[in-house]
Amino acid sequence: DPKYGGQGMPKTVSAFFDEMLSATSLSFKLYSELTIGAYNCILRHADDETKDKYLPKMVEGKWSGTMCLTEPVCGTDLGMLKTKAVEQSDGTHKISGQKIFITSGDQDLTENIIHLVIARASDSPPGTKGISLFLVPKFIVKDDGSIGTRNGVSTGSVEHKMGIKGSATCVLNFDDAVGYMIGPKNKGLSQMFTMMNLERI
């Protein structure tokens, strides 16, 4: 979207570049691929203030994105997730929990990492009907768009894999991390499918 610094070209144009980059280094390509997915999810479901604050830096390549779904207790059955989101007086949420197998979960290639995290907000129903979507930056972003203090997100470990070793697959710990709800409460799983459909199909 040119509004946020993009060129507005169709996917058919970028597909040629994607093919070359994937053939050269799939490990490196995954960093940008996850960012594209996070960008599209924020573009489709977040409010204008959030879009203006985060999307331009993601388009520039200064900030990257991730998709935080899987937990030690749940893989495909996301209705069992344990990560909690407690609303604060300022409208933000404190995110607490652990996510595993997070592609591009941590790196020093970009100035900030924008994690899209599914969690269960207070008083939400059990199962998939009680999942909400949150934007949790590695570093808090100030109102003027500059990077502030480190958020409560840390890397527990990096997985040792048989292939695609240049792509960091991480365990991420969220310890009262500041999160911002995207879209309506309890609609997070359907919103996250905007990103999942792009990344996994």
Regions inferred by a protein language model and the residue ranges of each:
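Structured core elements
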Residues: T66-C68, K82-V86, K94-S96, F101-T103, ...
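A short core secondary-structure module
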Residues: T92, S96-S146, R150
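Active-site-adjacent "gating/activation" loops or surface patches in catalytic cores
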Residues: Y4-T12, E19-L21, K62, E87-K94, ...
